């Protein structure tokens, strides 16, 4: 009888301790506010993955999360007012000016790097080098022979450059004018359309010159090179007297660098735990490239790829929300 009582007491104590432990865990998971944290979605696969990853991790911590479709550059108006809260990918290559202007107001905060490094530039398949001798040096594009090699019925005698969607920015129209390139900029309607055209041209060995970025699967799948423009400096974009054209800015290539997280400055006060998790979020180019490949080439959904990553990396993301 005495032994059984002790046994029951031990079981009771263990269960009580477990319940208390669970209760403490749930208490820690309670969000500082039940208002939804609004993360912005854009129009390329990698950003959809990054944002859904962050959303799922925040949900694990008990936060209410809402995903909101928003224009890549115009979103800063919503981030400044607090109508939108976090943008998970602001690329140094295309968004630096808008980000700097927003953070200068004090209403938007740079929440640190994502861990990924951005590269965006004009890109061509290597089979085009024979038709445009001198590549990858950008000077080759100034010749009539190269313009003709990259021309289409709609742009001839000018060459055709396929840029990203207009909402991405990037200053390609300005670059063509500043460098006096005999090319016409045609903007793809979507990220998917951009790379569908690359796939079609590559299979036919047809002429194509387009915007390619990394992290992405395209530079790994296709054999090609980025055009080497004059190296970017801040002065190139801000001071017309800099560079080969003394009268115009943007006479250089795109900047390379970080992919940043940005958000409404009020996030750290309203949701301090979520703020810390967003700051801690980090993923590298190889991981992201592999996930983009799963979606774009293997036909998996963003949600499935994100769920797989969450399942395999609990030790990692749990550190972000502890």
Task: Name the predicted role of every residue range.
Residues 34-37, 46, 168-184, 188-205, ...:
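An extracytoplasmic/periplasmic, membrane-proximal ligand-sensing/linker region
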Residues 51, 68-107, 197, 217-222:
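Pocket-flanking alpha-helical
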Residues 84-88, 160-238:
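Ligand-binding pocket segment of bilobal, Venus flytrap-like solute-binding proteins
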Residues 218-277, 281:
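C-terminal lobe and pocket-closing loops
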């Amino acid at each position: 009888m005495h032994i059984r009582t002790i046994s029951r007491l031990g079981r009771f104590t263990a269960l009580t301790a477990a319940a208390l432990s669970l209760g403490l865990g749930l208490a820690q998971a309670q969000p500082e506010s039940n208002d939804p944290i609004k993360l912005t979605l854009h129009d390329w696969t990698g950003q959809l993955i990054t944002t859904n990853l962050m959303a799922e991790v925040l949900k694990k911590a008990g936060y209410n999360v809402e995903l909101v479709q928003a224009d890549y550059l115009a979103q800063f108006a919503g981030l400044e007012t607090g109508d939108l809260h976090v943008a998970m990918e602001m690329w140094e290559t295309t968004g630096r000016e808008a980000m700097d202007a927003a953070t200068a107001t004090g209403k938007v905060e740079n929440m640190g790097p994502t861990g990924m490094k951005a590269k965006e530039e004009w890109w061509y398949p290597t089979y085009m080098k024979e038709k445009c001798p001198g590549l990858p040096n950008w000077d080759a594009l100034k010749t009539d022979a190269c313009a003709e090699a990259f021309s289409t019925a709609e742009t001839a005698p000018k060459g055709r450059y396929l840029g990203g969607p207009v909402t991405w920015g990037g200053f390609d129209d300005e670059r063509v004018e500043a460098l006096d390139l005999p090319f016409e900029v045609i903007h793809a309607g979507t990220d998917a359309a951009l790379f569908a055209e690359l796939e079609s041209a590559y299979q036919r060995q047809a002429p194509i010159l387009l915007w390619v970025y990394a992290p992405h699967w395209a530079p790994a799948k296709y054999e090609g090179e980025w055009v080497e423009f004059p190296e970017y400096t801040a002065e190139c974009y801000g001071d017309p007297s800099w560079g080969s054209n003394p009268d115009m800015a943007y006479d250089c290539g795109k900047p390379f660098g970080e992919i940043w997280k940005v958000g409404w400055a009020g996030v750290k006060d309203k949701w301090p735990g979520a703020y810390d998790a967003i700051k801690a979020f980090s993923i590298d180019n190889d991981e992201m490239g592999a996930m983009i490949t799963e979606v774009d080439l293997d036909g998996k959904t963003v949600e499935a790829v994100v769920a797989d990553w969450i399942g395999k990396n609990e030790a990692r993301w749990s550190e972000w929300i502890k």
